[in-house]
Amino acid sequence: MKPLRLSLLAVAMAAVLVACGSTSGSTVDSADADATVTSVDMAFEAETITVAAGEAFTVALVNQDSMPHNIAIYADSSKSETLFEGEMVTDGTIVYDIEALDAGEYFFDCSLHPEMTGTLIVEG
């Protein structure tokens, strides 16, 4: 019975360590990003972000909610053409590397919460 008890204890401890150490995204410094979007109370604080055309760019998502969020970029609000979909982050910050886009106006949202929306303006 002792080996079984030790095995169960080891499994339980491993589960606790995994649960405590798990994150849905990298905790990073958003200061170096080209644009920053903060999610608070199920809304994006920056409803419009602007970047330069023809250059790859970075967007930091600072998630201050306890729910997972991400940023997905679409050609327009119909969401028929997805240009980028970032991984989810819960209660932390993640910086997305996004390929260059042509000058224009694009739509972004959180994939899980479509009411969280914004406009990406690419100038050039």
Q: PLM ranges: what are they?
A:
Residues 22, 89-124:
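Extracellular/periplasmic metallocenter environments
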Residues 15-19:
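C-terminal motif of bacterial Sec signal peptides marking the signal peptidase cleavage site
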Residues 47-67, 94-109:
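Beta-strand cores of secreted/periplasmic/IMS beta-sandwich domains, seen most often
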Residues 29-55:
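N-terminal edge beta-strand
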